[in-house]
């Protein structure tokens, strides 16, 4: 654990921002980045980190004392970080969170998960939302999903996009040998798990080669730029076999260190983000931040993001055949690679500081700070 504060010095208006989990986890990274952005906009913030649930339990007395002195206690929560099941995660948090805590809830349950999983996770998230004084989600889409579970008000603070286009333009995109050839590939960024879009990308490439013929020069490899989610190692073998049966290739790079992430995103031939059940996406934000315009499946969340940041996505409406529609979008990118880059006038706001101000306004209202 790091960042333990002297709670005797906690003034009203101070924020204890808590992250739980491995530093490379997307929700944990988001929490750390949000805490830093809150500081940059002038908030008094102390970041408390715990790499597992046991360490988090050790923070509980600190959180209780801080709340007693008027400080805000805010956590980023996805159920998988707090227990082996959603029910266990909710049991823990409902039991130990101090009165007046607030949460940003991630990975809101949705029906496409399947009846049993949706019911279990939905009940857990409903309990969490009812147990705290303020709930934040990352999109209007997520707020609607939460409203289907529980009658609790939730504020929307979008995932920020850091505009790194200028720095990216100056940098030479050098990637490790294990990522060589990205410029020839269709590339998905982030964790590998079912429904992320890898299978659809292979179907789309198959359709494109069917239309264009075997020697067309269209991409023949799909690269998953990121690690495999826990429990889904079998998916890699399944996708590899599927690709080979189609005359294509599939590879997984594994975890991408921060020092290579931007270079890898810049090097990618065709950015692809066809999440089946996406409700908030750090991988979409990553593509956008370096100036890439990803091909994305149209849906309530991606359409919301396209309205929030016009010009940042190439939305694909299936119109009967998702693979055929995606093949058309990939064909456009092959014929005109400039389509995979953002136009010079595209605005990427809200950024990290904008979103930090939104969150602080929520905390100010919840805690009635003057």
Predicted regions and their residues:
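Conserved donor-binding/catalytic core segment of Leloir-type glycosyltransferases
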Residues: 175-196, 202-205, 222-223
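Membrane-proximal helix-turn-helix segments that form the acceptor-binding/catalytic region
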Residues: 92-96, 117-134
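Acidic donor-binding loop of glycosyltransferase active sites
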Residues: 263-279
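Nucleotide-activated donor-binding/catalytic signature segment of Leloir-type glycosyltransferases, i.e.
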Residues: 236-256
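Donor nucleotide-sugar binding/catalytic pocket of nucleotide-sugar-dependent glycosyltransferases
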Residues: 130-172
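Glycosyltransferase donor-sugar binding loop
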Residues: 219-237, 254
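A charged, aromatic-enriched C-terminal amphipathic alpha-helix characteristic of glycosyltransferases
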Residues: 321-325, 334-370
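A conserved mid-protein helix/loop that constitutes part of the nucleotide-sugar donor-binding site
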Residues: 29-33, 193-210, 285
């Amino acid at each position: 654990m790091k960042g333990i504060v002297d709670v005797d010095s906690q003034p009203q208006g101070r924020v204890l921002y808590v992250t739980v989990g491995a530093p490379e986890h997307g929700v944990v990274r988001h929490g750390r980045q949000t805490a830093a952005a809150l500081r940059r906009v002038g908030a008094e913030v102390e970041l408390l980190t715990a790499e597992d649930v046991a360490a988090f339990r050790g923070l509980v007395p600190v959180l209780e004392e801080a709340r007693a002195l008027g400080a805000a206690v805010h956590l980023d929560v996805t159920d998988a970080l707090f227990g082996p099941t959603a029910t266990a995660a909710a049991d823990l948090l409902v039991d130990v969170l101090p009165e007046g805590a607030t949460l940003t809830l991630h990975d809101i349950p949705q029906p496409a998960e399947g009846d049993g999983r949706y019911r279990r996770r939905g009940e857990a998230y409903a309990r969490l939302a009812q147990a705290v004084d303020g709930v934040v989600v990352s999109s209007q889409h997520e707020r609607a999903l939460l409203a289907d579970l529980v009658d609790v008000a939730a504020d929307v603070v979008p995932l920020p996009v850091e505009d790194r286009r200028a720095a990216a333009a100056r940098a030479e995109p050098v990637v490790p040998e294990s990522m060589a050839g990205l410029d020839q590939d269709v590339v998905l960024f982030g964790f590998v798990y079912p429904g992320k879009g890898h299978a659809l990308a292979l179907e789309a490439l198959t359709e494109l080669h069917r239309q264009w013929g075997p020697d067309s020069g269209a991409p023949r490899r799909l690269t998953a730029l990121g690690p495999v989610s826990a429990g889904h190692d079998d998916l890699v073998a399944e996708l590899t076999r599927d690709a080979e049966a189609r005359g294509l290739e599939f590879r997984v790079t594994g975890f991408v260190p921060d020092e290579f992430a931007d270079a890898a995103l810049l090097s990618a031939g065709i950015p692809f983000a066809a999440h089946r059940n996406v409700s908030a996406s750090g991988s979409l934000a990553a593509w956008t931040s370096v100036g890439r315009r990803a091909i994305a499946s149209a849906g309530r969340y991606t359409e919301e993001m396209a309205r929030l940041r016009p010009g940042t996505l190439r939305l694909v409406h299936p119109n009967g055949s998702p693979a055929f529609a995606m093949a058309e979008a990939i064909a456009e990118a092959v014929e005109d690679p400039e389509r995979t880059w953002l136009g010079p006038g595209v605005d990427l706001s809200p950024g990290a500081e904008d979103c930090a101000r939104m969150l602080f306004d929520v905390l100010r209202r919840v805690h009635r700070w003057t």
